[in-house]
């Protein structure tokens, strides 16, 4: 499926993680519910849930593979401690749900960040591993996951990525960015066709979107939560719809990324998305 027509994207960073409130069965049900509600763009990464996010997506969405946009990322690694504790994740999840201090320690450890590797061989191996976990032979969208700016100048890496793309292992190359400076550099890279970044409505985020538009490239946007959190009591989802309108009005916008593990929250976001689309069409 074309990423350009994907609409709202479900971010799956929390699926399979030690702190997710969902077990395996509930995670599968959430993904299938998302598909039933009309979500066709699913965003994950090799590191999410120590690979379990991809495994869950592969299991839940295999029957619909040709009808969805499947995106994943490579470049971040588990720490040695995370790798050691991965088999104990069900126990950690059970304890963290019942002991607040354990939950806090796990959350603090996650917030410290992870190692990164963008060596060509590692990225190729990571892509192949993701395909296996996702039960597919190709990705629609393959991101470099929060690289340092100098990674965008790594000619051997981009030569290897071009080779993998020619082999049909992924359709479109993107960069998922942690900041707008990196997003602007990624938008100008000749091989990068999609940039994922947090849109805040400010001048720099609009400049990134404008660069993408001029180059015929697209953006997948994060950041919707800032409008939701800024809403005044009694405003309902008006602020969220306003934020969505700002995103959807950008010609480069190919999708808005929303992460949730709650089916009700997902349905609410989709309702706001549809209202924003209706307002845009009526304008």
Model-based region annotation:
Residues 78-113:
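Alpha-helical membrane-targeting segments
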Residues 32-35, 122-142, 164-167:
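CE4/NodB-like, metal-dependent polysaccharide N-deacetylase domain
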Residues 2-8, 38-40, 64-68, 136-140, ...:
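Short, well-ordered coil/turn segments that N-cap beta-strands
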């Amino acid at each position: 499926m074309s990423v350009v027509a994907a609409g709202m994207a479900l971010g799956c960073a929390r699926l399979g993680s030690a702190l997710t409130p969902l077990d395996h069965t509930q995670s599968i049900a959430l993904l299938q519910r998302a598909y039933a509600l009309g979500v066709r763009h699913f965003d994950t990464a090799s590191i999410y849930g120590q690979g379990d996010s991809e495994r869950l997506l592969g299991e839940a969405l295999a029957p619909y593979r040709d009808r969805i946009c499947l995106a994943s990322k490579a470049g971040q690694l588990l720490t040695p401690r995370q790798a050691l504790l991965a088999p104990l994740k069900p126990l950690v999840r059970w304890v963290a749900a019942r002991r607040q201090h354990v939950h806090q320690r796990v959350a603090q450890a996650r917030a410290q960040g992870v190692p990164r590797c963008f060596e060509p061989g590692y990225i190729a191996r990571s892509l192949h591993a993701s395909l296996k976990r996702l039960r597919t032979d190709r990705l629609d969208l393959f991101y470099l996951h929060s690289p340092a700016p100098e990674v965008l100048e790594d000619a051997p890496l981009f030569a290897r990525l071009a080779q993998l793309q020619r082999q049909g292992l992924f359709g479109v190359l993107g960069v998922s960015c942690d900041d707008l400076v990196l997003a602007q550099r990624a938008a100008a890279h000749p091989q990068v066709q999609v940039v994922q970044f947090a849109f805040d409505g400010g001048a720099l985020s609009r400049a990134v979107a404008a660069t993408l538009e001029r180059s015929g490239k697209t953006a997948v946007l994060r950041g919707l939560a800032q409008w939701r959190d800024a809403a005044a009591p009694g405003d309902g989802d008006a602020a969220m719809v306003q934020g969505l309108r700002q995103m959807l009005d950008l010609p480069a916008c190919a999708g808005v990324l929303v992460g949730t593990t709650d089916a009700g929250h997902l349905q609410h976001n989709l309702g706001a998305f549809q209202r924003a689309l209706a307002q845009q069409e009526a304008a």
